[in-house]
């Protein structure tokens, strides 16, 4: 029998907790046997004294097991269960293409996603822009769509990882969100509760990233790769660039449109293509669906070019309650804002740098993101045709197009966009879309 306060004392004093102590405490979080004050105290003790890798694995698996752990065996799936998770960014619409692409190559993708908060967009908010799409279906419907279509992108259900829900809300209010150990356990407990065979992790780097520096992003990526592999899920973490908007747009309906244009081949932003292919190829390799990277990329290009990935996206949308002709007629269904107008820079030259976080916050100001959980969204607003770093900018070249509902909102966003995109006389050095892969063999 353990005492919560003794576990807190041990961690406060910088000692390692045993697996049994961690399991006891996490069970107490779930059953309310541990108080809010005790959870906050442990969070702060971990923040200052950290956890070793064994502790991180124990915390992650205990939180995973605090609620329902999905079981796919009864469905008789004839391929691996694979997934991707991103630490979040601006214009990060990858999941919408990657899920159907991986499914078209023989994987099963039960993707449990989140809503946006702060400057980052949420995958679920994009799907909420599609009329009828159920982001919170019954578990029966979720399983049916995964089996029949190969991919279902939905929100976290109430019985999945309840310990994380309670722990996270307390961390959010007690300044302990930024602990690498606690971030690792929070992210992975949700993903591992889906009983994945393999996971590709997208850790963003740069001005629009969650972590403030490259070093912090790399530390998080290494922690996630080590803990996930240690918990028995084949995982690779990629460090990818978020020093500019990833897609050509940022918002909800506008990103859904870009995802469909990508899947159908109408338009593929080269940076978005590079990161999507890197992550998706890694999923196929880890899941045993490709012999090497060249094979994985060839398979992915094939399902893009023959329309199979776009077809699967359409089947997922209709399977979860959306329109059956959504891919073909998306413009009929997606909401449009009242004002759609370009914004121009005050100087000429090259797009030199971008405060990506500020561009994300401009979307929030327009009404396309949340200042606090529970805020209602306007799915029609956002930015499109956002310039890329290195683009030549003159008086006739917009740096972005703003989708707004009022002149006042447009003016606010225009000022924010102009401030966030820095124009210089010289072009910046080109940076890679993917900085590094952290595989199990690198740990």
Swiss-Prot record:
Disulfide cysteine pairs (residue numbers): none
Molecular functions (GO terms): 1,4-alpha-oligoglucan phosphorylase activity; thymidine phosphorylase activity
E.C. number: 2.4.2.4
InterPro entries, per the entry: Glycosyl_Trfase_fam3, Glycosyl_Trfase_fam3_N_dom, Glycosyl_Trfase_fam3_N_dom_sf, Nuc_phospho_transferase, PYNP-like_C_sf, PYNP_C, Pyrmidine_PPas_bac/euk, Pyrmidine_PPase_CS
Domain of life assignment: Bacteria
UniProt KW keywords: Glycosyltransferase, Transferase
GO process terms (BP): pyrimidine nucleobase metabolic process; thymidine metabolic process
Pathway where it operates: Pyrimidine metabolism; dTMP biosynthesis via salvage pathway; dTMP from thymine: step 1/2
Reactions performed catalytically: thymidine + phosphate = 2-deoxy-alpha-D-ribose 1-phosphate + thymine
SMART domains: PYNP_C
Keyword Transferase: yes
GO CC, alphabetical: cytosol
Family that this chain belongs to: Belongs to the thymidine/pyrimidine-nucleoside phosphorylase family.
Function: The enzymes which catalyze the reversible phosphorolysis of pyrimidine nucleosides are involved in the degradation of these compounds and in their utilization as carbon and energy sources, or in the rescue of pyrimidine bases for nucleotide synthesis.
Subunit details: Homodimer.
Protein name: Thymidine phosphorylase
Species: Shewanella sp. (strain ANA-3)
Gene name of the encoded protein: deoA
């Amino acid at each position: 029998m353990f005492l919560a306060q003794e576990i807190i004392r041990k961690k406060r004093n910088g000692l390692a907790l045993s697996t049994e102590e961690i399991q006891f405490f996490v069970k107490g979080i779930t059953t309310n046997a541990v108080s809010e004050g005790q959870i906050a105290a442990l969070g702060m003790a971990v923040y200052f004294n950290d956890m070793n890798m064994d502790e991180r694995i124990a915390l992650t698996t205990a939180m995973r097991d605090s609620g329902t752990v999905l079981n796919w065996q009864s469905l008789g799936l004839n391929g691996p269960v694979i997934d991707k998770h991103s630490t979040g960014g601006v214009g990060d619409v990858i999941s919408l293409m990657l899920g159907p692409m991986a499914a078209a190559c023989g994987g099963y993708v039960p993707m449990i996603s989140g809503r946006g908060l702060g400057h980052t967009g949420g995958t679920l908010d994009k799907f909420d822009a599609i009329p009828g799409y159920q982001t919170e279906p019954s578990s029966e419907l979720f399983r049916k769509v995964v089996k029949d279509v190969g991919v279902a992108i939905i929100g976290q259900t109430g019985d999945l990882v309840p310990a994380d829900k309670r722990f996270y809300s307390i961390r959010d209010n007690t300044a302990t969100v930024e602990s690498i150990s606690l971030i690792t356990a929070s992210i992975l407990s949700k993903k591992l509760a889906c009983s994945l065979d393999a996971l590709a992790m997208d850790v963003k780097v740069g001005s629009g990233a969650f972590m403030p520096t490259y070093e912090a992003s790399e530390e998080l990526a290494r922690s996630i790769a080590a803990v996930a592999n240690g918990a028995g899920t084949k995982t690779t973490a990629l460090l990818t660039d978020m020093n500019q908007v990833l897609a050509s747009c940022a918002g909800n309906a506008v990103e859904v449109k870009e995802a469909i244009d990508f899947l159908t081949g109408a338009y593929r932003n080269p940076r978005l293509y590079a990161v999507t292919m890197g992550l998706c190829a890694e999923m196929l390799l880890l899941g045993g669906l490709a012999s090497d990277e060249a094979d994985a990329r060839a398979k992915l290009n094939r399902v893009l070019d023959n329309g199979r990935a776009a077809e699967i996206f359409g089947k997922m949308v209709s399977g979860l309650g959306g329109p059956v002709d959504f891919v073909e007629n998306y413009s009929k269904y997606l909401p449009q804002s009242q004002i759609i107008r370009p914004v121009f820079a005050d100087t000429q030259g090259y797009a030199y740098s971008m405060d990506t976080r500020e561009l994300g916050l401009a979307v929030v100001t327009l009404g396309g993101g949340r200042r606090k959980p529970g805020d209602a969204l306007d799915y029609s607003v956002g930015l499109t045709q956002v310039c890329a770093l290195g683009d030549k900018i003159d008086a006739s070249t917009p740096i972005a197009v703003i989708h707004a509902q009022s002149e006042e909102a447009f003016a606010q966003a225009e000022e924010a966009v102009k401030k966030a995109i820095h124009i210089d006389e010289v072009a910046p050095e080109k940076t890679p879309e993917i900085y590094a892969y952290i595989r199990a063999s690198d740990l």
